[in-house]
């Protein structure tokens, strides 16, 4: 299975507490025979503070300089088995949240991978419920929501629509 993940950073934990979590999941998926592509924007000086000097063997890392390069990676993700937009990328979050949904097809599942549910849900519930194109309106369109904790309260909060949590 080919997985394309749009996240904050796999190679730098600088201002990025999710890096080690991403590494563990990506490595485990790779060891099970899956191909991993991790797309990350060059933000917050993360590339200058990499703690993985070399890209890891378990993922292709693609660092993007701005939205134009992220758009190219979105095009390249077409046809992947799973495309996931991770929470807290740090730039172009709303644009990515919308754009990955355009890749959804019978062959491509699209997920939202929430690595900071309290923050994500607080922001979503602060949005007007009927305003189009907000993250809150996008939630039901994802095939699934991936979480690493929170239990029933977080699951029920995400049941805004029909996404599988």
What are these model-predicted stretches?
Residues 163-165:
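Conserved small/polar residues in nucleotide/adenosyl-binding loops
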């Amino acid at each position: 299975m080919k997985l394309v993940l749009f996240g904050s950073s796999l190679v730098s934990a600088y201002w990025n507490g999710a890096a080690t979590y991403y590494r563990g999941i990506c490595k485990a998926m790779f060891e099970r025979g899956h191909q991993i592509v991790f797309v990350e924007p060059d933000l917050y000086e993360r590339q200058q503070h990499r703690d993985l000097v070399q890209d890891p063997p378990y993922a292709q890392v693609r660092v993007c300089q701005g939205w134009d390069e992220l758009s190219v990676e979105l095009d390249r993700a077409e046809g992947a088995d799973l495309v996931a937009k991770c929470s807290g990328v740090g730039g172009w979050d709303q644009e990515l949240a919308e754009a990955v949904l355009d890749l959804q097809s019978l062959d491509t599942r699209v997920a939202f991978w929430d690595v900071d549910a309290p923050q994500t849900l607080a922001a979503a519930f602060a949005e007007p419920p009927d305003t189009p194109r907000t993250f809150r309106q996008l939630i039901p369109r994802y095939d699934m929501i991936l979480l690493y904790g929170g239990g029933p309260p977080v699951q029920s909060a995400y049941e805004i629509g029909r996404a599988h949590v």
